């Protein structure tokens, strides 16, 4: 599924994007954001992140620099830790109180 989404994004960048012009208010562009989100977070979560980004990209927003949040950023904020090569999702770690 991940490969299919990446292929569709590439087709969009090559075939459609040049004709539509540059309209994205963010950097990286929404299509680049979608590509990075799918690569870093997988097909399902990456697609959801890309859809949320597209909803934020409208004429009434200021735009600017909006990178894809990395796995290490999310884990530090949520307290959930997972190695990318692990065959499971994030695991909540509860540390004993001192």
Curated annotation (Swiss-Prot):
<protein>
    <recommendedName>
        <fullName>Putative membrane protein insertion efficiency factor</fullName>
    </recommendedName>
</protein>
<dbReference type="Pfam" id="PF01809">
    <property type="entry name" value="YidD"/>
</dbReference>
<keyword id="KW-0997">Cell inner membrane</keyword>
<dbReference type="InterPro" id="IPR002696">
    <property type="entry name" value="Membr_insert_effic_factor_YidD"/>
</dbReference>
<dbReference type="GO" id="GO:0005886">
    <property type="term" value="C:plasma membrane"/>
</dbReference>
<keyword id="KW-1003">Cell membrane</keyword>
<comment type="similarity">
    <text>Belongs to the UPF0161 family.</text>
</comment>
<comment type="function">
    <text>Could be involved in insertion of integral membrane proteins into the membrane.</text>
</comment>
<keyword id="KW-0472">Membrane</keyword>
């Amino acid at each position: 599924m991940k490969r299919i989404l990446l292929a569709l994004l590439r087709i969009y960048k090559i075939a459609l994007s040049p004709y539509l012009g540059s309209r994205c208010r963010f950097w990286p562009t929404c299509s680049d954001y979608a590509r990075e989100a799918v690569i870093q977070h997988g097909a399902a979560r990456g697609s959801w992140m890309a859809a949320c980004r597209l909803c934020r990209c409208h004429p009434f927003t200021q735009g600017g620099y909006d990178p894809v949040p990395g796995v290490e950023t999310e884990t530090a904020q949520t307290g959930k830790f997972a190695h990318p090569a692990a065959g499971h999702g994030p695991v909540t770690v509860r540390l004993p109180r001192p």
